[in-house]
Amino acid sequence: MNAHKTAQNMSQEALYDVVRAPLITEKATLLSERNQVVFKVAPSATKPQIKAAVEKLFNVKVTGVNTLVQKGKVKRVKGRPGRRSDIKKAYVQLAEGQSIDLTAKLG
């Protein structure tokens, strides 16, 4: 697959540009019991890139990736309306029996 070839050639910094940070929320904690992990990813990242980056960074087998773009909220900044940035989330399904310890790897 083409995404695997590009991930093998990517540097460690480039992989962290694709997968930026884990998202630790109540929903993400519940999903971790079903072998799913949630990451904040680059807005331009594709599903094959995300899959390849997670497999290489964490040495796990990924069976699926679902993504969504969470639109930024409108907030007031110094009395004027402003807007937070949009973020892209990736829900990564791991193979049976695999897990990622996010506190040890990224801490």
From Swiss-Prot:
Recorded superkingdom: Bacteria
GO cellular component terms listed in the entry, alphabetical order: ribonucleoprotein complex; ribosome
Keyword presence, Ribonucleoprotein: yes
Pfam hit, one: Ribosomal_L23
MF-aspect GO terms: rRNA binding; structural constituent of ribosome
The keyword Ligase belongs to this UniProt entry's keyword annotation: no
Biological process annotations from GO: translation
Keyword field: Ribonucleoprotein, Ribosomal protein, RNA-binding, rRNA-binding
TM helices/strands, residue ranges: none
Family: Belongs to the universal ribosomal protein uL23 family.
Function: One of the early assembly proteins it binds 23S rRNA. One of the proteins that surrounds the polypeptide exit tunnel on the outside of the ribosome. Forms the main docking site for trigger factor binding to the ribosome.
Subunit structure: Part of the 50S ribosomal subunit. Contacts protein L29, and trigger factor when it is bound to the ribosome.
Protein name: Large ribosomal subunit protein uL23
Gene: rplW
